[in-house]
């Protein structure tokens, strides 16, 4: 990961969130302990995610952005900026808020980073693909994409702007697919199905999944591209420290069913599988995606060769080392082998 020769500090926005805190954790594993981390902690408990992590300075977003606007050199030489801070709620209806928070702020930060000769890596989203279910490639005509919600559109707006401004070949956009893992407890209804199903199973002994309304696809056989958060940040750091440019899918490249996901949760909890299929709300039926699967050819061609954590391995680690004991990333229980990674944990015990 030495494709760039820049010197200076690292900045991570959204640093207390699911992906942001995992990225700071990954930076720590690579010996980086002087990052500047930025977020909006508010009244949530996501501050707990920062406690075991090592960094040099924390700033609230409302302090950080005015400081760099007033003095672009406020933090000295900057080597890399990982912009993961955004409103990620696909149900958010305030378009004005999403434009300001997800689009304008990203424009301002990208302009500042490039002006400082810093590497700029930002969170785009697989939501930009809209209802498309096949051939999810990064080189698709961006104007052919139609996001299904305002969140996805706010991300697409920046992708389009970066292309128009001619800077997409100097920065990296990460199209995250279905990311799950520790440190998502603050996300409420936007948590992964792993977290929500874990709660359902421990409270009721069953998991509710939507019925299928597409001929040939049975209930629970709808698929998603699930990716463990530790893989997601390993990819982000690889791309940030390589000569990569443009948009990259961040997924496993393998579509798995909701039934597969839930079965892995029951296995991790050593409970018998018990799934209840429920009707899908009418408002959702017309725009529900029955399949997502990232193409990862560009990622592999960009030199990322590490294997992806299997769904069974990732779910087992997330549940047994984090959710059950109630721990955050960096405070986890040791793995059975002591290796500390999902890949060292057997898919079944």
Predicted regions and their residues:
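C-terminal substrate-binding subdomain of Rossmann-fold SDR/epimerase-dehydratase oxidoreductases
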Residues: 201-349
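Glycine-rich phosphate-binding loop and adjoining beta1-alpha1-beta2 segment
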Residues: 37-65
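NAD(P)H-binding glycine-rich loop region in Rossmannoid oxidoreductase-like domains
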Residues: 52, 61-101, 130
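N-terminal Rossmann NAD(P)H-binding glycine-rich loop of SDR-like oxidoreductase domains
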Residues: 10-30
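SDR active-site strand-loop-helix element
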Residues: 13, 38, 81-85, 120-126, ...
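Catalytic helix-loop patch of NAD(P)-dependent Rossmann-fold dehydrogenases
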Residues: 100, 104-108, 115, 119, ...
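NAD(P)-dependent short-chain dehydrogenase/reductase
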Residues: 134, 160-234, 264-266
């Amino acid at each position: 990961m030495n494709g760039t020769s820049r010197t200076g500090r690292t900045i991570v926005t959204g640093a207390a969130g699911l992906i942001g805190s995992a990225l700071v954790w990954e930076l720590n594993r690579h010996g980086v302990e002087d990052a500047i981390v930025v977020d909006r902690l508010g009244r949530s408990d996501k501050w707990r995610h920062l406690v075991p992590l090592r960094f040099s300075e924390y700033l609230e977003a409302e302090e950080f952005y005015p400081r760099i606007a007033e003095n672009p050199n406020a933090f000295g030489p900057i080597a890399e900026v990982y912009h993961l801070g955004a409103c990620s709620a696909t149900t958010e209806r305030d378009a004005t808020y999403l434009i300001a928070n997800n689009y304008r702020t990203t424009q301002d930060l990208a302009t500042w980073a490039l002006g400082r000769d810093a590497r700029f890596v930002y969170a785009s989203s697989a939501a930009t693909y809209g209802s498309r279910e096949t051939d999810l490639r990064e080189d698709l005509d961006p104007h052919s994409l139609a996001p299904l919600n305002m969140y996805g559109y706010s991300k697409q707006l920046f992708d389009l702007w970066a292309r128009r401004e001619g800077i997409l070949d100097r920065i990296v956009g990460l199209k995250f697919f279905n990311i799950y893992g520790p440190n998502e407890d603050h996300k409420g209804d936007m948590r992964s199905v792993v977290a929500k199903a874990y709660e359902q199973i421990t409270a009721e002994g069953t998991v509710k999944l939507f019925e299928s309304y597409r001929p040939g696809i049975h209930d629970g056989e709808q698929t998603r591209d699930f990716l463990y958060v530790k893989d997601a940040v390993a990819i982000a750091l690889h791309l940030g420290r390589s000569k990569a440019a443009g948009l990259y899918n961040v997924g496993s490249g393998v579509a798995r069913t909701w039934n597969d996901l839930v079965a892995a949760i029951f296995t991790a909890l050593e409970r018998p599988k018990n799934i209840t299929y429920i009707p899908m709300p009418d408002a959702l039926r017309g725009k529900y995606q029955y399949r997502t699967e990232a193409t990862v050819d560009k990622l592999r061609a960009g030199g990322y060769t590490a294997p992806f954590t299997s769904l069974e391995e990732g779910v087992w680690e997330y549940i047994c080392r984090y959710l059950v004991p109630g721990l955050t990333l960096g405070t986890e229980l040791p793995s059975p082998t002591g290796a500390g990674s999902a890949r060292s944990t057997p898919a079944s015990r």
